[in-house]
């Protein structure tokens, strides 16, 4: 660049430049005063943002800036002196306030002056650099002009006429050169002075940097503290939310319990009324059943007697049937014989009939012969008639015998027909055949026919009797079948009852053992509950202390939040300043491009002027035109190569070929300046090497930090994986435990169902339902105590809720304050934006002023060009032109290289802009996240308010329900008072036992409820674990995003390192080619300055990137700490859950033992119930026997037991005998003898004694001193089977017979004895049983 100082050329333009500089200084001071407050907040960036590059604006400032500096210093010193004098003159009372104010004002003034001095130093440095560049240019021009003059003097001797003019011009040029040398010396002095000032400022900068490092460390510590406080606050909020949830659950549980208690009270009332109704109905049923039993027993006895008679009759009938069958067989045989005899007799009869006929004929013949032979023949006739009379008598005897035999046969046939119907027809046929066989006899003998008719009538009567008897037999057989069916049914019912009694006995034994175990476990659990209450009190104390700590931490949080807000404001301001700096850098680049274009245009104008001068000097440059044409051809070839570059540079190369011809004489002067520039370049390169070395060190440190943090992240990821695996295992274990819990709950439900069924049976069998009211009183008292406790706990919870609501309100107020501060910061930001707009307007004004100054500079440059045209007239040699052409080619190659470098730099600038846009996007995303968090906070506040309203509603409902419960309790107490009057002394023992039973049942229910609550807690813990796992997943995602961001930053850093390496290579290439860069050093310097600025900007961006990486590293460290703390918290919670699971296991085992104990107790009670049932049956039997005794007569007593007193003396022997006596024995003796064997309670024995008739002898019993109870007491007070025990001494030697009731009772007694002996762990119950037996 061919620029010279305007002050040495034209003295006319000095005042205008001075005025402009003064105006500019005034504007700078005014802008400095407005930007002091900003620079106080962002001192770090203000120090790092000193303009280190040179621009054309700095060339327009003159040396008057130093005078202004001196004037300002003098004014400051005068002001300071005046302030000190004024301070000395002031009185002592206002010394402290004035001192503080003066010191503050002085500090402000010093800060302003420091900033002003820094800017002036920067401007002086830039001016020095510009002056050095101008001096170098002038020196190069002088050397060129001198060399050209020498060349012209040696070459052209004919032009001696122009020598004096040229000498004058040379003298003027030398004078100008001397003046410029003097200016250079002064500028060198200024440079030395500015270097000293720079050294001091660098020392001050190092001090400030150290202070900034300390401030950064403090900021990092404060950020960590803020994060920790935020974590603690979040944990406190989370704990508060958990407590609110727990309170809501507790309230829900309490309401459910209260509702259940109310429902149970109502159910108990209903049950009580139902029980009373059922009791009355049962009593009526018992009376009806007693009557029915008596009737059924009478009917059974009648049936038994009838059965016996029927059996006897049946036996007789069977005997008769057997006899009849034998007779039938005999009759059949006889019939066969008689048939054979009848055939013989028929034959004989026919023979007799023939003989009779013959006799009749003979008789007729004899009569005729008699008549013929009168008297002489009388004697032989008498003899013949005597012979025939004998024959007739014999025949009649035979007929009579046969008739008798026929009658016998007919009688036998009738008997056979009565027994069987088979032989009736055959016998009748035989009889008819027999009767028909003798028609002659019947006709002859009327007596036989009459007898036959009588026999037929007898047969008919016998048949009628037979039919009647068969009907009776059938009826008797039907009755027998019914009786047998009834007997089988009774046997089956007896067997079922015996089996039921055995089962009930076993269940009662199990329930008794279960109740004992439940009582033991209840004692243990009461101890545990007391210990837990102590732990709860200790935890409440710890919680109160933690709340106090939380309050202090919240105050600290507020302070830290204020600091964070201030820091965020500072960060936002710095960010805005960075954006402004980037915009300024962009504007500067654009201005530089515009300036370069203007310089190119200016050079084009210069070239046009030079072409005009060349037209005037065509005579002197005819020889050079050929060479110029040759050079133009070469330039055209170079232009073809540089088509990718700018077209304007091709025009510049064409015009520079003509311009370099006139600058051949200045090469010698420029060589010296080139050496100086080379030394400056070496210094710059050394500085660049140092900067690069620092960059490499920083890069290595950053890489090492990234490696360490990546290793830490890897370790953390491994830990998180292990933790997730452990959490999964614990979740699986929890699932298994839940399954076991569900199974055990199912078993408990089954056990409770069985217990309920047994209780139902027990309540059905028991008749003393009225005694449950005493237990209701106890339950009410217990429920009132529980209600009072719950009220106290609710009051405490309400207080805690009030405190927490106050804390929430305080947090809301803090949030509102934060919102107000945010609004205030937004307002301040708007103000700052307005100030930035005003500053931009001022900068535009300054730019217009700079444009005016540039116009002035252009005018001075035109004048310098005019002066140089005079020198160009002397340029005529061709050798130097050839060298210039070569140099132009080299410069063109260098220009192409520099253009490529500029392209690379533009690419780097674009990449940096992309990184900035990415950072802006990340900042915007963070702002969006902050907005989302604020919205979540608002939603959480709304939810807390809704929960507070719900809690208030629940409190009102609880109060209403408590009032209703109190009213109901009062009503129940009145009912209890009315019921207590109807209770007796005998009921108290039963009430105690039943109260213990129901307490155990209630405690079992409470345990079940506790198990359900523990299940709910387990589910809540699982939900919390799921939420924490979700949070861990989110954190893992955030860490992955941060890793990606770090990788991107790594990529950007690697890209920057590559660009730095490329720049180093290019710098080395420039160092190699620095010797050849003689003519375009100014352009190279400007470009180097641009590169230096870009390097500084890159350094700033690298510093910002390092800061961002440090911030990310700090965030990662914070996240690591948070994750570690959360992992520790999760570990603690897991340990707590494991402890709770172990406790649950132990509690489940204990409850299983309790359930077993209750089952054993229930088994015992069921056995006792079986005993009672047996005794009730014996009691009913005695009553039946008593009623039988009233009906039977006294002689039976004397018949069965002639010694009743002896039997009463020996009850056991009489026992064994009396159960085997036939039912005909009277029951009165049994009532006297079997009382001791039945083992009835003493009240029932005395009732029986009272009911016994006065004639019966008195009973003797071993037990004495028994209180007599009337029969009304039996009706009023129900019978309790648990108040007495078995007599252990009454044991039989022989085996019991289960077919009889005594055998069953003996068997039950033995089983009870066997069940009572192994129960060594419950001596109190055995003592109670013994006491009952004694009482």
Curated annotation (Swiss-Prot):
Keyword Cytoplasm: yes
Basic and acidic residues: bias regions: 1313-1323
Predominant location category: cytoplasm
Coiled-coil zones: 92-1183
Record's keyword terms, sorted: Coiled coil, Cytoplasm, Cytoskeleton
Entry superkingdom: Eukaryota
Bias-annotated ranges (Polar residues): 71-82, 92-104
Subcellular location field: Cytoplasm, Cytoskeleton
Statement: the UniProt record of this protein carries the keyword Cytoplasm: yes
Region ranges (Disordered): 71-104, 366-388, 1313-1335
Descriptive protein name: Cytoskeletal protein Sojo
Organism: Xenopus laevis (African clawed frog)
């Amino acid at each position: 660049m061919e620029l010279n100082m305007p002050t040495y050329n034209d003295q006319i333009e000095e005042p205008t430049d001075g005025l402009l500089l003064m105006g500019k200084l005034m504007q700078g001071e005014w802008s400095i005063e407005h930007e002091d407050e900003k620079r106080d907040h962002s001192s770090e960036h203000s120090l790092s943002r000193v303009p280190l590059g040179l621009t054309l604006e700095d060339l327009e400032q003159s040396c008057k800036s130093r005078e202004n500096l001196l004037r300002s210093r003098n004014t400051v010193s005068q002001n300071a002196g005046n302030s000190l004098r004024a301070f000395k003159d002031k009185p002592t009372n206002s010394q402290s306030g004035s001192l503080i104010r003066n010191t503050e004002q002085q500090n402000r003034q010093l800060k302003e002056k420091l900033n002003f001095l820094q800017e002036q130093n920067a401007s002086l440095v830039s001016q020095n650099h510009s002056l050095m560049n101008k001096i170098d240019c002038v020196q190069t021009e002088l050397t060129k002009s001198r060399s050209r003059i020498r060349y012209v003097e040696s070459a052209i001797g004919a032009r001696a006429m122009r020598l004096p003019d040229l000498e004058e011009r040379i003298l003027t040029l030398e004078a100008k050169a001397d003046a410029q040398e003097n200016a250079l010396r002064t500028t060198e002095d200024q440079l030395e002075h500015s270097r000293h000032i720079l050294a001091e400022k660098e020392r001050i900068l190092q001090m400030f940097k150290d202070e900034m490092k300390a401030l950064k460390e403090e900021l990092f510590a404060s950020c960590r503290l803020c994060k920790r406080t935020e974590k603690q606050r979040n944990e406190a909020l989370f704990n508060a939310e958990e407590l609110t949830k727990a309170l809501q659950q507790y309230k829900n549980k309490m309401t459910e319990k209260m509702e259940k208690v109310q429902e149970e009270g109502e159910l108990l009332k209903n049950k009580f009324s139902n029980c009373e109704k059922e009791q009355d109905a049962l009593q009526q049923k018992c009376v009806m059943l007693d009557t029915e039993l008596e009737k059924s027993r009478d009917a059974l006895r009648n049936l038994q007697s009838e059965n016996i008679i029927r059996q006897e009759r049946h036996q007789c009938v069977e005997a008769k049937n057997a006899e009849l069958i034998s007779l039938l067989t005999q009759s059949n045989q006889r019939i066969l014989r008689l048939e054979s005899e009848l055939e013989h007799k028929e034959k004989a009869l026919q023979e007799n009939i023939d003989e009779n006929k013959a006799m009749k004929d003979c008789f007729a013949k004899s009569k005729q012969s008699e008549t013929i032979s009168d008297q002489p023949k009388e004697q032989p006739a008498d003899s013949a008639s005597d012979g025939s009379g004998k024959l007739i008598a014999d025949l009649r005897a035979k007929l009579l015998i046969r008739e008798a035999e026929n009658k016998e046969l007919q009688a036998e046939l009738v008997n056979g027909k009565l027994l069987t119907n088979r032989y009736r027809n055959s016998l009748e046929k035989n009889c008819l055949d027999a009767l028909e066989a003798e028609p002659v006899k019947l006709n002859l003998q009327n007596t036989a026919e009459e007898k036959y008719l009588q026999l037929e009538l007898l047969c008919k009567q016998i048949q009628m009797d037979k039919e009647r008897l068969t009907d009776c037999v059938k009826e008797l057989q039907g009755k027998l079948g019914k009786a047998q069916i009834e007997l089988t049914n009774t046997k089956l019912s007896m067997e079922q009852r015996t089996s039921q009694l055995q089962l009930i006995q076993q269940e009662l034994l199990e329930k008794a053992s279960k109740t004992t175990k439940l009582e033991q476990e209840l004692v243990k659990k009461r101890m545990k509950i007391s210990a837990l209450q102590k732990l709860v009190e200790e935890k409440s104390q710890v919680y109160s202390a933690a709340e106090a700590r939380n309050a202090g931490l919240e105050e600290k949080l507020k302070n830290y939040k204020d600091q964070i807000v201030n820091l965020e404001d500072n960060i936002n301001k710095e960010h805005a300043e960075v954006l402004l700096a980037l915009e300024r850098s962009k504007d500067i680049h654009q201005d530089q491009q515009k300036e370069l274009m203007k310089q190119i245009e200016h050079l084009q104008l210069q070239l046009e002027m030079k072409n005009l001068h060349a037209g005037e000097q065509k005579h002197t440059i005819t020889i050079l035109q050929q060479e110029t044409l040759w050079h133009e051809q070469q330039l055209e070839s170079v232009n073809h190569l540089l088509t990718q570059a700018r077209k304007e540079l091709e025009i510049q190369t064409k015009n520079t070929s003509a311009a370099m011809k006139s600058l051949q004489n200045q090469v010698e002067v420029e060589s010296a300046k080139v050496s100086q520039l080379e030394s400056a370049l070496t210094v710059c390169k050394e500085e660049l090497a140092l900067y690069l070395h620092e960059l490499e060190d920083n890069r290595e440190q950053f890489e090492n930090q990234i490696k360490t943090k990546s290793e830490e992240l890897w370790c953390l990821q491994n830990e998180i994986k292990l933790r997730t695996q452990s959490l999964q295992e614990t979740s699986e274990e929890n699932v298994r435990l839940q399954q076991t819990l569900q199974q055990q709950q199912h078993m408990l439900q089954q056990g409770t169902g069985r217990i309920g069924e047994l209780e139902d049976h027990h309540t059905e069998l028991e008749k003393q339902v009225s005694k449950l009211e005493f237990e209701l009183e106890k339950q009410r008292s217990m429920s009132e105590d529980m209600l009072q406790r719950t009220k106290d706990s609710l009051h405490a919870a309400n207080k805690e809720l009030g405190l927490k609501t106050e804390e929430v309100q305080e947090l809301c107020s803090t949030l509102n304050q934060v919102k107000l501060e945010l609004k205030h910061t937004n307002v301040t930001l708007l103000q700052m934006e307005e100030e930035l707009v005003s500053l931009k307007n001022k900068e535009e004004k300054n730019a217009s002023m700079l444009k005016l100054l540039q116009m002035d500079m252009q005018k001075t440059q035109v004048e310098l060009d005019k002066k140089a045209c005079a020198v160009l007239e002397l340029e005529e040699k061709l050798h130097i032109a050839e060298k210039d052409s070569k140099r132009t080619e080299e410069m063109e190659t260098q220009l192409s290289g520099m253009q490529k470098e500029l392209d690379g730099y533009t690419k780097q600038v674009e990449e940096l802009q992309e990184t900035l846009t990415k950072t802006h996007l990340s900042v915007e995303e963070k702002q969006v996240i902050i907005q989302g968090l604020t919205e979540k906070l608002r939603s959480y506040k709304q939810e807390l308010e809704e929960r507070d309203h719900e809690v208030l509603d629940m409190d009102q409902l609880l109060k209403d329900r408590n009032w209703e419960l109190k009213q109901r309790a009062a009503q129940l107490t009145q009912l209890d008072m009315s019921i207590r009057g109807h209770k007796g002394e005998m009921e108290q023992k039963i009430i105690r036992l039943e109260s213990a039973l129901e307490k155990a049942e209630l405690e079992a229910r409470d345990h079940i409820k506790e198990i359900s609550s523990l299940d709910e807690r387990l589910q809540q813990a699982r939900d919390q674990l799921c939420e924490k796992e979700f949070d861990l997943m989110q954190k893992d995602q955030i860490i992955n995003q941060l890793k990606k961001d770090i990788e991107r930053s790594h990529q950007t850093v690697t890209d920057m390192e590559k660009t730095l390496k490329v720049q180093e290579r290019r710098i080395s290439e420039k160092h190699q080619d620095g010797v050849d860069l003689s003519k375009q050093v100014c352009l190279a310097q400007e470009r180097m300055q641009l590169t230096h600025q870009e390097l500084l900007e890159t350094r700033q961006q690298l510093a910002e990137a390092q800061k961002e990486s440090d911030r990310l590293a700090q965030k990662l460290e914070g996240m690591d700490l948070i994750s570690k703390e959360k992992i520790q918290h999760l570990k603690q919670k897991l340990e707590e859950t494991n402890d709770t699971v172990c406790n649950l296991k132990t509690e489940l085992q204990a409850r299983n033992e309790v359930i077993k104990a209750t089952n054993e107790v229930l088994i015992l009670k069921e056995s006792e119930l079986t005993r009672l049932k047996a005794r009730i049956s014996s009691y009913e039997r005695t009553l039946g026997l008593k009623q039988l005794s009233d009906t039977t007569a006294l002689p039976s007593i004397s018949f069965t037991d002639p010694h009743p007193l002896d039997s009463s003396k020996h009850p056991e022997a009489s026992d064994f005998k009396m159960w085997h006596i036939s039912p005909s024995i009277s029951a009165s003796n049994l009532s006297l003898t079997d009382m001791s064997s039945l083992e009835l309670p003493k009240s029932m024995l005395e009732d029986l004694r009272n009911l016994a008739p006065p004639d019966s002898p008195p009973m003797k019993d071993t037990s004495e001193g028994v209180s007599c109870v009337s029969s009304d007491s039996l009706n009023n007070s129900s019978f309790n089977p648990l108040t007495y025990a078995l007599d252990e001494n009454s044991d039989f030697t022989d085996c019991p017979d289960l077919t009889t009731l005594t055998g069953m009772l003996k068997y039950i007694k033995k089983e009870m004895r066997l069940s009572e002996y192994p129960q060594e762990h419950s001596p109190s119950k055995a003592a109670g049983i013994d006491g009952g037996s004694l009482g």
